[in-house]
């Protein structure tokens, strides 16, 4: 994405103020500000990691965490790209929500992936082989055109269609991710409403006390340093949408649940849930 970014930095742990103009898919502009919350800063410190939580409400974006510069730094999207992969595949009729992707008995990275599953089931299990198969069906040329059409991250997918989101060259910033997922939450992406609704249904993580939390995790294990994501949105009881993108440095010994733990604690701290 072509972005104009200006920032004023004070000699402290935080940015004093920050504004951004964006050329988004729907030509909106977002204002980005530092969210002053030392508690969330400490949440990341306590896990001995660096990270940022980007929150978008309407056109206002707030940054929290102990490494705010990550918000405008590019990282491989890892399995958060499954959201766009599914949108492209469904829109172009390379699959449908009822198709069963067959497991052929091969050894997979996790035993939970060693079964037949639909695209939605594979989304919830983050089953990489299913989405690699979908990417191969889409093909390199169409995938490149669609990623460019959506203006996702640096829009570079290279010459191998089934791993560019895991090891590069595709990269995206947390700010770009939160803008993308906010448009998905509001059904504003340039895909059919039906396709967007189907993908949103795949992303429901939790429903409690009138709040719905949608999201997709990502963990880039094959790059150094490793990168973790949890990107999605909260639908509040009154229907208001609050989008989020958590991005952090991961280590092999960390539990996968650390991303959800940090997100949920932070959302509660901010009175979003």
UniProtKB/Swiss-Prot annotation:
Keywords assigned: Antibiotic resistance, Cell membrane, Hydrolase, Lipoprotein, Membrane, Palmitate, Signal
Superkingdom of origin: Bacteria
Lipid attachment in record (S-diacylglycerol cysteine): 18
GO MF term set: beta-lactamase activity; penicillin binding
Subcellular location: Cell membrane
Active site, per annotation: 79 (acyl-ester intermediate)
Its membrane topology: Lipid-anchor
Covalent lipid sites (N-palmitoyl cysteine): 18
Protein name per UniProt: Beta-lactamase OXA-133
